[in-house]
Swiss-Prot record:
Family: Belongs to the KAE1 / TsaD family.
Organism whose genome encodes this protein: Moorella thermoacetica (strain ATCC 39073 / JCM 9320)
Keyword Transferase: yes
Intrachain disulfide bonds: none
Cofactor: Fe(2+)
Catalytic activity: L-threonylcarbamoyladenylate + adenosine(37) in tRNA = N(6)-L-threonylcarbamoyladenosine(37) in tRNA + AMP + H(+)
Cell compartment(s), UniProt: Cytoplasm
Gene Ontology molecular-function annotations: iron ion binding; N(6)-L-threonylcarbamoyladenine synthase activity
Protein name per UniProt: tRNA N6-adenosine threonylcarbamoyltransferase
This enzyme's EC code(s): 2.3.1.234
UniProt cofactor note: Binds 1 Fe(2+) ion per subunit.
Length: 342
C-alpha cells in the first residue's frame, strides 16, 4: 500500500551510470528543485564513444561539486534531505560505483534512508515528472543506447517486460550507423539532423518483425544492411547520398518501434503509452508514435527532451514512489552493471 505523507519529501538523487555525473533535488516526486548535470561528451568525443576508465575518473572529480550545486540551487541543506537515491544499475560498473559509494556514505552520515533505483525505471519515471497523472495501466517504450524494452506498468509497484531487443538496442544501432556515415559522437542526434535533409523512402532497408505478434526487437540486421549498402557503394564507386541513408534508416527503426508499441498497448489494453530513454528525444519517433496513438485512441506521453537523456531528476521521481512504500536499500548496496528490470 502507498502511504500518504503529510509533509514535503525531499529526495537527493544521484546518477552516474555512464558519462554524466548528475544530482537532483526532487520534492514529492513532482517538483524538480534542482537538476545538475556535468556532461563528459566533449571528453569522449575524440574517442568516438565513452571510455569507461576515463568516465569513472571524471565522475570522481565531479560528484562532490555537482551535489553541492544541486543543494545550493534548491536552497536546501543536507539536513533538509529525507532520503538519498542512487542509480545502481545497469551501466558501466566503474561509473556506477562512484555514485553508489558516494550515496551510501552520504546516507550513513546523514542517518537517512538509501534508495537504489534501476536506471531504466528512472527513464520511465521521467514521464511521471512531466505528467504525474499519466493514466495507468500504461505501456512504456524504453529506447536508449544500451536498451530497447516494452514495459507494462500496471501501477507504481507492478511492472512486466513484454519485449526486449535480441541483439542491438535501437540507440546502439543509431550510434553505429552514424559512425559509418562519418558523423561525430554522440551519433544519434547528429544522424537525426542529417536525416532532415534526406528522403526516408529512398532506400528500402529491411524491417525485422520476428515471429508473428512478437514484441521483441532486432536491429542488427538493419544495421548490417546499412553498412553493407555503404560498403558496396564505395566498392563500385557509386555516389552515396548520406542524408537519404540516414533518413531511410531512421524511418525503418521508427516503424518497427511504433508498430510493436501499438501492438503491445492494444493487446494489453493499456490506457496510455509512454516513450522513455535517450532515443525518446528523436523527433521522428515522437511524431510517428503520437500519430499512431491518436489513430488507436490512445494518448501518448513523452518527457521534455532535457529529461530524455541521463539525469538525476528522473531517479529522484522513481525513488519517491519507492520511498512511499519504504523500499529502502541496505548500506551493502552494490553496483550491478547488468541489473535486470524485473
Amino acid at each position: 500500500m502507498v502511504k500518504e505523507l503529510a509533509t514535503e519529501t525531499n529526495i537527493l538523487a544521484i546518477e552516474s551510470s555512464c558519462d554524466e555525473t548528475a544530482a537532483a533535488i526532487v520534492s514529492d516526486g513532482t517538483r524538480v528543485r534542482a537538476n545538475i548535470i556535468a556532461s563528459q561528451i566533449a571528453v569522449h568525443r575524440r574517442f568516438g564513444g565513452v571510455v569507461p576508465e576515463i568516465a569513472s575518473r571524471h565522475h570522481m572529480e565531479n560528484i562532490v561539486p555537482v551535489v553541492s550545486e544541486a543543494l545550493a540551487t534548491a536552497g536546501l541543506a543536507f539536513s533538509d534531505v529525507d532520503a538519498v537515491a542512487v542509480t545502481y544499475g545497469p551501466g558501466l560498473v566503474g561509473a556506477l560505483l562512484v555514485g553508489v559509494a558516494y550515496a551510501k556514505s552520504l546516507a550513513y552520515a546523514l542517518g537517512k534512508p538509501l534508495i537504489g533505483v534501476h536506471h531504466l525505471l528512472g527513464h520511465i519515471y521521467a514521464g511521471f515528472l512531466a505528467y504525474p497523472g499519466l493514466p495507468l495501466p500504461a505501456v512504456s517504450l524504453v529506447v536508449s543506447g544500451g536498451h530497447t524494452n516494452l514495459v507494462y506498468l500496471e501501477d507504481h509497484t507492478t511492472r512486466r517486460i513484454l519485449g526486449s531487443t535480441r541483439d542491438d538496442a535501437a540507440g546502439e544501432a543509431f550510434d553505429k550507423v552514424a559512425r559509418v556515415l562519418g558523423l561525430p559522437y554522440p551519433g544519434g542526434p547528429e544522424l537525426e539532423k542529417l536525416a532532415r535533409e534526406g528522403n526516408p523512402r529512398a532506400i528500402p532497408f529491411p524491417r525485422a518483425w520476428l515471429e508473428e505478434n512478437s514484441l521483441d526487437f532486432s536491429f542488427s540486421g538493419l544495421k548490417s544492411a546499412v553498412i553493407n549498402y555503404l560498403h558496396h557503394a564505395r566498392q563500385v564507386g557509386q555516389e552515396v547520398n548520406r542524408a537519404d541513408v540516414a533518413a531511410s534508416f531512421q524511418a525503418a527503426v521508427a516503424e518497427v518501434l511504433v508498430t510493436k508499441t501499438l501492438l503491445a498497448a492494444t493487446s494489453y489494453r493499456a490506457r496510455s503509452i509512454l516513450l522513455a530513454g535517450g532515443v525518446a528525444a528523436n523527433s521522428v519517433l515522437r511524431r510517428e508514435l503520437r500519430s499512431a496513438g491518436e489513430q488507436a485512441g490512445l494518448p501518448v506521453f513523452f518527457p521534455p527532451r532535457e529529461l530524455c537523456t541521463d539525469n538525476a531528476a528522473m531517479i529522484g521521481c522513481a525513488a519517491y514512489y519507492q520511498y512511499l512504500r519504504r523500499d529502502f536499500a541496505p548500506l551493502s548496496l552494490n553496483a550491478i552493471p547488468d541489473l535486470p528490470l524485473n
